[in-house]
Design a protein with these regions (language model features):
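Nucleic-acid endonuclease domains
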Residues: 1-39, 46-150
């Protein structure tokens, strides 16, 4: 969902950051190839541009969660100066905040969080606070165990 001037760039940077983490090469991404599909095999990257805080949430739109069920969701926060930022400055940090499973998303509470442009987004999102996500130091092991078992 595009709700601000920087949403597309935020998503792209999130995918680049994850590719660097996962494959030690930011170029091993699927940007431009994955429209309407998960970002990486069995992994959906959820990137947001906000000042980093552990009270932020991994958000998955209810309608998206019904359409596709990647086994893993990873939250990345592009740490901008303001929640109303309309550009991403050079040397801005990306925090790979944590991960959740599709099952955890499906059992999470739902809420309309609005958008950067208005108080109502017109849709509900499943949400899990960043501080409640699995830590990234467990991700690769769980991911590769899941791949082997499928």
């Amino acid at each position: 969902t595009i709700a601000s001037k920087i949403d597309t760039l935020t998503g792209i940077l999130g995918e680049f950051a994850f590719a660097q983490y996962m494959y030690n090469d930011w170029k091993k991404n699927r940007v431009g190839e994955n429209k309407g599909d998960v970002n990486f095999k069995d992994i959906e990257i959820k990137a947001s541009a906000f000042p980093f805080s552990e009270s932020l949430n991994l958000l998955v739109r209810e309608d998206y969660a019904q359409k596709r069920k990647p086994p893993f969701y990873v939250q990345i926060i592009i740490d901008v100066n303001s929640n109303k930022a309309d550009k991403i400055e050079k040397d801005t940090k990306a925090y790979i905040a944590g991960w959740a499973t599709a099952k955890e998303i499906d059992s999470a509470p739902k809420k309309d969080f609005g958008s950067k442009l208005s108080d109502s987004g017109g849709y509900k999102c499943f949400y899990i606070q960043i501080k409640s996500l699995h830590e990234m130091n467990t991700f690769k092991k769980d991911y590769y165990n899941n791949v082997k078992s499928n």
